[in-house]
Structures are given as structure tokens and as C-alpha cells.
From Swiss-Prot:
InterPro entries: Ankyrin_rpt (IPR002110), Ankyrin_rpt-contain_sf (IPR036770), CAP-Gly_dom_sf (IPR036859), CAP-Gly_domain (IPR000938). Residues 360-371, 423-432, 440-461 have a biased composition (Low complexity). Residues 303-345, 504-546, 643-685 form the CAP-Gly domain. The modification Phosphoserine is found at residues 556, 608. PROSITE patterns: ANK_REP_REGION (PS50297), ANK_REPEAT (PS50088), CAP_GLY_1 (PS00845), CAP_GLY_2 (PS50245). This is CAP-Gly domain-containing linker protein 4. Residues 353-479 are annotated as: Disordered. It comes from the Eukaryota. ANK repeats lie at residues 65-101, 149-180, 186-215. Keywords: ANK repeat, Phosphoprotein, Repeat. Pfam families: Ank_2, CAP_GLY. One of its GO terms (cellular component) is intracellular membrane-bounded organelle.
Length: 704
């Protein structure tokens, strides 16, 4: 049924609805408005509707502008529209729209759009909260769902991390509504949605308002188990890794302790299930195991615990890196020396292999007790600092090496002492530093069956096994036939040029790091961090980077451009809240999110395979004249230049802003890239702008 099919209904006044004489009072019938494109002024210089523009205001307040056209305006994911949700929404109501009527393209109501408009960095939270309260007073039904996403208002508010809207919605809802499920998220609750998208504010508010932290989705996962694993996040997402740790701990703390009458013999309870779990993993008590590829010890306990639900493993570590003596909360699960005991989920442990030096770098397919992301063989990760563990691998002809000066002392490491370490600290500084790539080593086999490893003279007490070559990706490996040497010029993160001065382990973070002296003062130190001098250079000329971020400098500008465009932006669909629904791309966007939620294999694969707005980036490229959004200031700008620059490597965008908030007139130094008014120009990386919700780094022609 459409608006044109409605019969004439006599209007009745009321104290609240009297402000909107066209509302259908006394009728719960809602309609779905036909699909329309957003109206735009004929002389408009930009590609979106701006309610603050005079010509756009004429269209907005024109009674001839239809409800379908106003819904089309609401679909535009730009601050100018989302921050004026109340103005546009009231115009929709004034044109005779029922408060629960839906947009024909997205099947969303005004309340759904309002929950979206509270998103940080795009909308205005205060405006969204006031308008949501107004809609609920007018009779908006918070339980209505979009038939495309199956999400209700609470789900949208949780997805976009708007705690204030969550409180408004649940204030008038039934207690059970807080745990309403959504099929698009494996029939998880709003708490699952917030946890999966790292919405800390939403998680905290939902828990305060009675959300069930032990609710299991269709995959048997509680909210704590859908939090992305920090080990699968790239280095530039260290902040997200810290948030993930905080959210997971918050959810685990909220899970009620299991009430059983056999607490005194808790370590022996559920013995059959524990034995079955161990058997499926090929383990038994007393086996040597590795925890998340990081710590090595002996399996002493397996079963349920008082401190958390599910099956847990108790391990006695080889080194005093644990947290207890086998007891937690006055319950003794096993016995060991203080600081040698640690507990871990069964999904985080694996049997310590004897032939680890020949371990291949392929995803492990061992069974896990919960449906989780596919785990990766951790033999190639670097051990935690001060763990005393070293890694030994079989040397292959194709592996490149980093050659150190002959004056360095060799360090001998027995093969039997080699371990399978891996950095899985949840802190913000240790999120998957090695990017799950193999970094070959230079090994010299001795007659005694041992291998000697060269160590860095800059830090003789800390450099241990495993000097690694820089292998940024499979694509880049093809032209990394030679080794990276101390003193060689390299490109750091695809942006900064410098010379390698140091390679080895450090005190400030686990893993192996390059110390690089930059050619320009764009660094962060003088070669020292935390009072430890790793190499010497001028202040602000020194920088440290993991091997995955260092690339041999090529004389080809095309190669530099390719490196820059490939490395400067990594996105994770779970964190993207663009949710853009513009015109024909809406259904493709929904299909994209469905496919990610239902068929996700590994989070690592997601970093590089995410798409938005129905793959629009595959057909649209930024060019001179394109209108983009500068995300750092929420300012619209016009692209005036696309290409390389003299001051830094890679592709840059020259933007002309609409106000004098820039830094130049299109010239930097002695080189002019474009022309505009003084302080109206700025040059930025493509990743700093978006075009219709798509990152500019995805819309750059590699042949620029």
C-alpha cells in the first residue's frame, strides 16, 4: 500500500499531534513510500543536499517536495544532512506522514534514521536524542524492524554506538526488548552487535540497563566471544585492540558465575566434556602446549571454572610469566609455583610440536569448542620480550637474509629449545606486529646440530634469534629478491624515506623492529626510546617500524605510488559505520554486510577485502573537480590535484576548501600543484577524505 491508496480520514486534534494537523490520528496504519531520488538545486556545485544552503532550503520547505524525496535526502550519509535530522524529519511529518511510515528503498522508519544520525563524527547526538524522544511521544514503535536488515531502533543505536539513544529507546520499551535478537547478526542481541563493532559506550549502557551478557547467538557465542581478537588487527589499529580488550573484560566480568552444588569439587566437574574437548584437540593432561603462540608450558587442568563460563585450560608455564599458582578466587584448580600458573580458553592453546622449525605458515584447521574466526599457525610470530624463547626455522633457498657486519658475536641456540612464540598481548602496542607473514632468517648450521644466529651490536643483551627480512605482502615479495642491509635506504609505511640503522628486539614492544634515520625531521626520536639508545641520529629524525612496514626504496615513482595506495588504508567492516543507503547502492550495501556477518572466515582476511556501497569504488575514481569530505574537519572540499609530490612519496590530493581553514594556496615550497585563494588549499593523503562514504584511498587510479 502506498500513500496514494489511503482513503480520506477525518482529522481529530490532540494536545501533542495538534502541532502536525496532517497526521492520521487514531490510525495505526503505516505505509511504504515509493523510491525517489534526492532533489537538488539546478545550480548546485556539490553532490549532496545541504539544508544550510539557501537554494536547498527552498526545496526542503517547498510543499511540493514529496515525502519520498525527503526520505532520499535522509539517506545521504553526510554531516550536513545527519546533523539536521530534526528539520528534515519534521518536514516529513508535516506532509502527512505517519510516524511509523517507511522509506521504500531501505524500509526504515524515521526512528531508524534518527538512531543512525547519532553516529559520532557524522551526526549530532543532542539533536538525535531530542528528535527520537519527540517521535516516541508521537507514537513511534521502537520494536519495528527494517525488512532488509531485520534491525530495530535499539539495534541501530547499538551499531552506531549512541548510548544516549539506547537509554531513550529502552525507557519506554518492555524489559525483554533489551535482548531482542537480529538475524543479520547470527540472531545475536544488541549487546552482540555492540561488542562485535567495538562500541564500548553502547556495551556499558546495555549492561547497565539489563542486557544479558550470557545470551548465546545461533553459533553458541556469548557477547564476549564475538569481540574481535586484537591479534588479528593490523598495527595501525592499536587503539582498537585496546578497546577490544576493555570490552571483553567488561563483558566477562558481567557474566554471572555458574551456580552448582559441586563447587568444592569444581575442578573435577564436567569431566566427560573436558576429556572430549582435549581429545578433539589431540591433547591430554601433562602435554606441552603453547598459549596463543606466545607462552609455553605444561597442561595441568581442563574443565569448567568459577571465574568464567565455558571450558578452560590451566597451564604451568616454563617461565614466571603467569598470574597465579593454579588457584583463582580461593579455588585451587592445580598446583604450581607462584606466577607460573595461567588459565586460557581451550581455543587459545595448541600442542607444542617437536619439528617447529619446519612449520608452514598456513591457517590451522584444528577443531575449536566455539565457532570462532579461523586461527592461524603461530609458529612464525615473535616471542614476548624477556620470554627466553627463540625461534628456529628451516632455511630455504628462496629466503632472503639481512646481513650484519662480520664483527658481531654469534649466538648459539639449540634446536630443542626453539619454541612457537607469538605476540598476542591485548595492549595497544602489540597487535599482530608481524602481520602473519614469514620473515626468513640467516642461520648457520654447525656440526653439533645447532644453529648460530647473528645479533645486533646496538643491543647485544636483547637481540636474539630470528633476523627477519621485510616482507610487506605477498605482492611485494616478488620484487624483494635481495636482502635488506644496515645502511640501506628504505620506505617506511609507504610515506617516509630513510636509512636502516638498527634491527633487533627492543624494550618498548615485542617482536623485531627496524630503527630508521629519516631524511626529513618527520620522526619521533633520536634513536632512543625509554632511555635505551638503539642507534644515534638527530632529534625527530629517528623512527622505529616493524618489518611489515618497511620497503626497499625503488627509483620508480610508479612503485612508490603503488606501495602508498596499497598500505595507507586498512578497514574492517565491523568498524565501518557508514551504512550508506544512497539510491541504487543501498541493497548492495546490505548484501555486503550480510555476507560479512554470515560467512566471515578470518578477521585478517577482512582487513583487506571490505567493500562499501555496493563496490562503488570499483567504478568511480577521484579526479579534479570531485567533491569530497575531509574527515578530519568534516569540511567539504573540491579536488584540484591528484598525483605525486616533491615533499613526500606516494599519491596526494590537492583540495580547495570552502573556507579559509587550509594551509596554503596550492603551493608547497617552490612547487605549485594547483591554484586557489590563500589558506584555502591543503594537500592530504587520499585516506583522509571520503566520497559518498567511501575512503578516498580506494578511489585512486594507481596510474596517477
Amino acid at each position: 500500500m502506498t500513500i496514494e491508496d489511503l482513503p480520506d480520514i477525518p482529522l481529530e486534534g490532540s494536545s501533542l499531534i495538534g502541532r502536525y494537523p496532517f497526521l492520521f490520528t487514531g490510525s495505526d496504519t503505516s505505509v511504504i513510500f515509493s523510491i525517489s531520488a534526492a532533489p537538488m538545486p539546478s545550480d548546485c556545485e556539490f553532490s549532496f543536499f545541504d539544508p544550510n544552503d539557501a537554494s536547498c532550503q527552498e526545496i526542503l520547505f517547498d510543499p511540493k517536495t514529496s515525502v519520498s524525496e525527503l526520505f532520499a535526502i535522509l539517506r545521504q550519509w553526510v554531516p550536513q544532512v545527519q546533523q539536521n535530522i530534526d528539520i528534515i524529519g519534521n518536514e516529513i511529518l508535516k506532509r502527512g506522514c505517519n510516524v511509523n511510515d517507511r522509506d521504500g528503498l531501505t524500509d526504515m522508519t524515521l526512528l531508524h534514521y534518527t538512531c543512525k544520525s547519532g553516529a559520532h563524527g557524522i551526526g549530532d547526538i543532542e539533536t538525535a536524542v531530542k528528535f527520537a524522544a519527540q517521535l516516541i511521544d508521537l507514537g513511534a514503535d521502537a520494536s519495528l524492524r527494517s525488512r532488509w536488515t531485520n534491525m530495530n531502533a535499539l539495534h541501530y543505536a547499538s551499531y552506531f554506538d549512541v548510548p544516549e539513544l539506547i537509554r531513550v529507546i529502552l525507557k519506554t520499551s518492555k524489559p525483554k526488548d533489551v535482548d531482542a535478537t537480529c538475524s543479520d547478526f547470527n540472531f545475536g542481541t544488541a549487546l552482540h552487535i555492540a561488542a562485535h563493532n567495538l562500541c564500548a559506550g553502547a556495551v556499558k549502557t546495555l549492561l547497565e540497563l539489563g542486557a544479558n551478557p550470557a545470551f548465546r547467538n545461533d553459533k553458541g557465542q556469548i557477547p564476549a566471544e564475538v569481540v574481535p581478537d586484537p591479534v588479528d588487527m593490523p598495527l595501525e589499529m592499536a587503539d582498537a585492540a585496546a578497546i577490544a580488550k576493555e570490552i571483553k573484560q567488561m563483558l566477562l566480568d558481567a557474566v554471572p558465575l555458574p551456580c552448582t552444588s559441586a563447587k568444592a569439587v569444581l575442578p573435577n566437574s564436567d569431566h566427560t566434556t573436558s576429556r572430549a574437548m582435549l581429545t578433539s584437540l589431540g591433547l591430554k593432561l601433562g602435554d606441552r602446549v603453547v598459549i596463543a603462540g606466545q607462552k609455553v608450558g605444561t597442561l595441568r587442568f581442563c574443565g569448567t571454572t568459577e571465574f568464567a563460563s565455558g571450558q578452560w585450560a590451566g597451564i604451568e608455564l616454563d617461565e614466571p610469566e603467569g598470574k597465579n599458582n593454579g588457584s583463582v578466587g580461593r579455588v585451587q584448580y592445580f598446583k604450581c609455583a607462584p606466577k607460573y600458573g595461567i588459565f586460557a580458553p581451550l581455543s587459545k592453546i595448541s600442542k607444542l610440536k617437536d619439528g617447529r622449525k619446519t612449520t608452514t605458515h598456513t591457517p590451522s584447521t584444528r577443531a575449536t569448542p566455539h565457532a570462532r574466526s579461523q586461527k592461524v599457525d603461530v609458529a612464525h610470530f615473535t616471542s614476548r620480550v624477556n620470554s627466553g624463547l627463540t625461534t628456529s626455522k628451516k632455511e630455504t633457498a628462496s629466503e632472503s637474509t639481512l646481513t650484519l657486519p662480520p664483527s658481531e658475536e654469534p649466538k648459539t641456540v639449540a634446536e630443542n629449545d626453539a619454541a612457537q612464540p607469538g605476540s598476542m598481548s591485548s595492549s595497544s602496542s602489540s597487535s599482530s606486529l608481524d602481520h602473519k607473514q614469514s620473515y626468513p632468517k640467516k642461520l648457520t648450521t654447525s656440526s653439533g646440530g645447532k644453529k648460530t644466529l647473528s645479533k645486533s651490536p646496538s643491543l647485544p643483551s636483547r637481540a636474539s634469534a630470528g633476523l627477519k627480512s621485510s616482507a610487506t605482502s605477498a605482492a611485494n615479495n616478488s620484487h624483494h629478491e635481495g636482502a635488506l642491509h644496515l645502511g640501506e635506504r628504505v620506505l617506511v609505511v609507504g610515506q617516509r624515506v630513510g636509512t636502516i640503522k638498527f634491527f633487533g628486539t627492543t624494550n618498548f614492544a615485542p617482536g623485531y623492529w627496524y630503527g630508521i634515520e629519516l631524511e626529513k625531521p618527520h620522526g619521533k626520536n633520536d634513536g632512543s626510546v625509554g632511555g635505551v639508545q638503539y642507534f644515534s641520529c638527530s632529534p625527530r629524525y629517528g623512527i622505529f617500524a616493524p618489518p611489515s612496514r618497511v620497503q626497499r626504496l625503488s627509483d620508480s615513482l610508479d612503485t612508490l605510488s603503488e606501495i602508498s595506495s596499497n598500505k595507507q588504508n586498512h578497514s574492517y567492516p565491523g568498524f565501518r559505520r557508514s551504512f550508506s543507503t544512497t539510491s541504487a547502492s543501498s541493497q548492495k550495501e546490505i548484501n555486503r554486510r550480510n555476507a560479512f556477518a554470515k560467512t566471515k572466515t578470518t578477521l585478517r582476511r577482512s582487513w583487506s577485502s571490505s567493500t562499501t556501497a555496493g563496490g562503488l569504488e570499483g567504478t568511480v575514481k577521484l579526479h579534479e573537480g570531485s567533491q569530497v569530505l575531509l574527515t578530519s574537519s568534516n569540511e567539504m572540499a573540491t579536488v584540484r590535484y591528484v598525483g605525486p609530490t616533491d615533499f613526500a612519496s606516494g599519491i596526494w590530493l590537492g583540495l580547495e576548501l570552502r573556507s579559509a581553514k587550509g594551509k596554503n594556496d596550492g603551493a608547497v615550497g617552490d612547487k605549485r600543484y594547483f591554484t586557489c585563494k590563500p589558506n584555502y588549499g591543503v594537500l592530504v593523503r587520499p585516506s583522509r577524505v571520503t566520497y559518498r562514504g567511501i575512503s578516498g584511498s580506494k578511489l585512486i587510479d594507481e596510474n596517477c
